[in-house]
Amino acid sequence: GNEKQLIEIFQGVHPEDWCFGTYRSHLHCLLKGIPREQVMAEILAGHSIHLEFPDYRFYSSAIVAGGLPIALGTALGLKRQGKPENVWCFCGDMAAETGAFQEAVKYAWGFDLPITFVIECNGLSTNTPTHQVWGVPHQHTTIGETIWRTHTWAEGRVIRYCYDREDWPHYGVGQMVDFDQVGQAPTGERSDV
């Protein structure tokens, strides 16, 4: 999974910073300092893919690339108000290939906005290999990357890391988490899909 990379990235995220995540933001919430009981309550209430914690300046969207323009607007507002906070915008590799991402990076670069984009590349758009969607010959290689990598502004402002999905229970690996069992003694059995 991507736990190691996220732990490293969140060492640079401050409590006053703003975070915008994707539909897979459970760990992001915990690393931002949101109490696990609050995160778990939202997940169990059916809000797993759109976690919102305004008191912690944390927002997420289940729409691919949906958080990009909102994060960009937040960064623009912070700059206009002269505030010292930074915006952290997380997206997947498929979102990073969209026009919304390319435009957000270009606008942030042009106006030197306080935003860091983090591309979490697992080679998939939900379950479709990203490189096949765009006709790119190799996994973890993208066409859009060549655009923003040419800007010196992007150094440290566009972070891209790759990871492979492992055997942890989540969509696409054939295992699911049974939340009816949360808080009960583990049985040692896994539920296969």
Q: What are these model-predicted stretches?
A:
Residues 2-111, 132-136:
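Cofactor-binding active-site loop characterized by glycine-rich and histidine/acidic residues
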Residues 111-193:
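Thiamine diphosphate
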